[in-house]
Amino acid sequence: MLEITEIREIISHFGLSAEAITDFHDTSHNDDDKRWNYVLDNKYVLKINSVGAMWEERLQEIKRLIARYRSVGVYCPDLIPTLNRAMSCSRNIGGKEYTCFVEEFAIYPIIDDEFEHDRKEVIEHLGLLASKYTNVDLSETKSMWSIIDLAPLDIDIDEKQENTNMLTDALRRHGYDLLAQQVDSLNSTLREKIKEVFADLPRCVYQGDLNTTNELYKDGRFMGLIDFNMSGTDVNVNVFLNETNWFPEDEEFDALSVREIISKQDAEQAEKMSVILRHYTLNDLEQYVIPYYKRIVNIFQYPDVCSMIKWLNNDSRREKCACLIKALTEKPL
C-alpha cells in the first residue's frame, strides 16, 4: 500500500491534492493484474492498475462512454484528466509498470444488499442509450456478454460457448449423453442463424456489468453506475436479453414445475424487455434474430449453468433438472 506522500506526488499530475486516504479497496485478480483503489478525502479515487488491465486509449474510450451515460440521465463519476489532458500517468512500483488514473468519488452510495430494488428501473436506460448511440464510436473491446466476438477475458471461445461446454460435460458425467448431444446441436444451430446476420446487427457500447455492486441509489431509487472496466461493444438485442433474463433460484426450482419455470422465464423477460423497448425500436433484422439470442441467453448464462450443474449433482434434483434442460432445448423457436 502506498504512503500518502507517494499518492500526493501521483495526483499532482492531475492538478489535485489530498489530506488523507479515507478508504482503500484491493480488487486485484492476480499478481499480473493488480487493481488498487485509494479513496482520497472522499472526493477522488486514485486507481492504480497493472498496465495490461488498463491503458490510456481505453481510458479515453471510457471517458467518452461516461459522457453518453450522463447524457441519458445515468449519473457516473467522471474521469479526471491530467494537467496535459491525458487520462493517466505511468508509475514504476516495485519494479512493475502501472497505469494511474483518477475518478470522482461517487455522490451516491451503492445499494444495500438487503434492499429489494426494481430491476426494471435499472435497465430502462439501455433503450435510451441504444436509441441515441447505436453504431456511434464503437469500441474495439467487446462486452462481457458478447458471443461470437470475444471479450477481453475470453480465450479461444466466448463465455457462452464455455458455459455450454460445462453444461454438456456435466450431462455426460451423469449419463445424459443424448441430451448433451441435443444441447450441443441446438447451440450450433442458434449460432449459425446468428452468424448469417451478425455483421449487420445494430450495436452500441455498454457499461457491461450491471449488478448491485456497481449500481448507485438515492432514497431507494436507481441513480447511476460505477465501474466501466467491463464496458465494450455488443449487439443491442444480446445485451437487452442478457440483462432481462430470469432463472430460478433453488427454492423456486423446487417449488415450480418445469412448465411453470419456463412460463415464468418468458413472462419475466417479456415484462422487462417492454421497459427497454419503450425507448428503442427493433428493426427487421433484430426481430428476426431475437429468438436465437434469447434461447442462448435462457440456457447458457454462467450463474444459471452453475445452478444446473449443482442440481445435476444432487440426487433429488437431478432428474427434474434434466427435464428442464430438455424442455428448454426442445421448446419451439
Task: Go through the PLM ranges and name each one.
Residues 237-282, 297-316:
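Active-site activation/catalytic loop segments of kinase-like enzymes and analogous catalytic loops
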Residues 283-297:
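All-alpha amphipathic helical-bundle segments outside canonical DNA-binding/catalytic cores
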Residues 43-140:
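ATP-binding pocket architecture of kinase catalytic cores
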Residues 1-23:
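Juxta-kinase regulatory segment immediately upstream of eukaryotic protein kinase catalytic domains
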Residues 12-13, 138, 159-208:
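An alpha-helical support segment within catalytic cores of ATP-dependent transferases
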Residues 16-39:
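ATP-binding glycine-rich phosphate-binding loop
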Residues 31-42, 191-238:
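Active-site acidic catalytic loop and adjacent metal/ATP-binding pocket
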Residues 116-177:
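A cross-family kinase active-site recognition segment
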